[in-house]
Design a protein with these regions (language model features):
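Conserved N-terminal catalytic core of the sugar/cofactor nucleotidyltransferase
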Residues: 2-5, 27, 31-113, 121-123, ...
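Acidic, Mg2+-coordinating phosphoryl-transfer loop and its flanking beta/alpha structural elements
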Residues: 384-421
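Active-site neighborhood of HAD-like aspartate-dependent phosphohydrolases
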Residues: 253-297
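N-terminal nucleotide-binding beta1-loop-alpha1 segment
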Residues: 1-19, 44, 251-261
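A short, conserved beta-strand element in the Rossmann-like catalytic core
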Residues: 91, 115-118, 223, 263, ...
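Catalytic-core segments of class I nucleotidyltransferases/pyrophosphorylases
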Residues: 108-109, 116, 122-129, 140-145, ...
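Conserved Lys-Pro-Asp/Glu-containing loop-to-beta segment of HAD-superfamily phosphomonoesterases
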Residues: 109, 352-354, 360-390
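Substrate-recognition element of Asp-dependent hydrolases with the DxDx(T/V) motif
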Residues: 52, 283, 287-323, 330-347, ...
């Protein structure tokens, strides 16, 4: 697969730091961010690269040449083959694509030259190949979805809506944001070449929403643009600390698996109405701390109300949108939500017989945790299962996780759990931020 890197922008928001450097040449721990991008591509077998340049183009072209030389910073070979397209006039972030389409004969990876990423590109490419479509977006949750563009998708990851910052949005929504990495088909570039500047998102990709030809690939991996001095400083620290590299799914991850009812939200029995969903005190702060400490936050919840015919999948999705929205308002996010819709007991009015089965996903069965572990390359022995019931503890035990039982009142039962805490907030403060959280990192 060929990679196209858009490196022609002026970087006006970060001009005070960049000075006479094009933004892709800003150093991250001693190496230009563009060099780090090329290194990540090379390590994963992507060695055919086309870079579009414009503002201060010679600084990029003289540093990297055709890719056959060595880095002036490290002395190591670049190890890639580089071609260039020079914008004679600003063409927006996609105008150059139409002018290089004769060099693109298969689906290609499209990157921004000022974005720091550390992701498993092979997983991304495999998803795109399996699902087809004209374009796949790399999407992830963030700590400020309320002022970010949002991607809405169906259960097959087909994008149904693309909500820009300016668009009206629903009261509740999934925390899914376009990260700025794409895999595109050259078929998108057929037809007349547009005049002037072309906006990739608004003119090319957003119109595909709802057609079935635009997919989104959800991942917790590190992708961050460095378009402001504050973001640039944060990226530098994330690279120096190892946080960026640790999130790559080629490396083993550690997770906190979370029950939902009674752990995240107030327990009301069978939760059937979205208005009954209410975050427990301290939960948003706890999940935010899980995010900050580098653990994946994964919800695994039994929802027999589906099998009972009392809640539809669409209604459950709305409840989970509310959960993500409330967490997002406090700067917290979930990396994934898994639910089991089944229940083994049959013979009740209104039930859905096809879901009244014995399954491998209903806790204490391990199915949801195993699915998450495969998807995110999770080391279960380094992870925690946290919940307020026996089935939560047993599910964790069944996959080799450490377990924590939440018990706000009375004496907690002894179920073999490693820790007991009054709330999720207390668990995070006592365990993840303490010695036990450190020893398995």
């Amino acid at each position: 697969m060929k990679a196209v890197i858009m490196a022609g922008g002026r970087g006006t928001r970060i001009a005070a730091l960049a000075g006479d450097l094009p933004k892709p040449m800003l150093p991250i721990d001693g190496r230009p961010v563009l060099e780090r991008e090329l290194g990540s591509l090379r390590e994963q077998g992507v060695t055919d690269v086309l870079i579009t340049v414009g503002h201060l183009a010679p600084a990029i072209m003289e540093y990297f040449g055709d890719g056959s030389g060595c880095s002036p910073q490290t002395g190591r070979p670049f190890g890639v083959h580089i071609e260039y397209f020079v914008e004679k006039e600003p063409l927006g972030n996609a105008g150059a694509l139409f002018r290089i389409r004769d060099r693109l004969d298969e689906d290609f990876l499209l990157l921004n030259g000022d974005v720091m990423f550390d992701v498993d590109l092979q997983r991304f490419a495999a998803f795109h190949k399996v699902h087809g479509g004209l374009a796949t977006l790399f999407t992830h949750p963030n700590g400020h979805p309320y002022d970010s563009g949002l991607i809405v998708a169906d259960s097959e990851q087909r994008v149904t809506q693309w909500l820009t910052k300016e668009d009206a949005r629903p009261q509740y929504y999934r925390n899914r944001v376009n990260a700025g990495l794409h895999i595109l088909s050259p078929k998108l570039l057929e037809g007349d070449i547009p005049a002037g500047k072309v906006d990739l998102d608004r003119q090319i990709l957003k119109p595909l929403a709802g057609t079935g030809q635009l997919l989104c690939y959800d991942s917790p991996e590190y992708v961050k643009d460095m378009g402001t001095p504050e973001r640039y400083a944060a990226v530098c620290e994330d690279v120096r600390s190892g946080h960026a590299a640790a999130r790559n799914l080629r490396r083993k991850q550690k997770a906190v698996f979370l029950d939902r009812d009674g752990t995240i939200n107030r327990y009301v029995g069978f939760l059937r109405n979205i208005d009954e969903f209410e975050l427990l005190p301290g939960v948003a702060q706890a999940v935010r701390k899980i995010n900050e400490l580098g653990w994946l936050a994964v919800v695994v919840t039994n929802q027999p109300v589906i099998a009972r015919g009392e809640v539809t999948e669409e209604q459950l999705e709305a409840i989970h949108c509310k959960m993500e929205t409330l967490l997002g308002r406090e700067g917290a996010w979930l990396d994934a939500i898994y639910y089991c819709p089944h229940h083994p007991d049959k013979g009740f009015p209104g039930e859905r017989p096809e879901l009244k089965i014995h399954c491998s996903c209903r806790k204490p069965a391990p199915g949801m945790l195993l699915d998450a572990a495969q998807r995110f390359n999770i080391d279960l022995s380094r992870s925690w299962m946290v919940g307020d019931g026996k089935n939560d503890v047993l599910a964790g035990k069944n996959v080799g996780c450490r377990t924590a039982l939440l018990c706000a009142d009375g004496t907690p039962p002894e179920l073999g759990q490693e820790r007991t805490a009054p709330s999720l907030y207390d668990f995070v403060e006592q365990v993840l931020r303490g010695k036990e959280g450190e020893e398995k990192r």
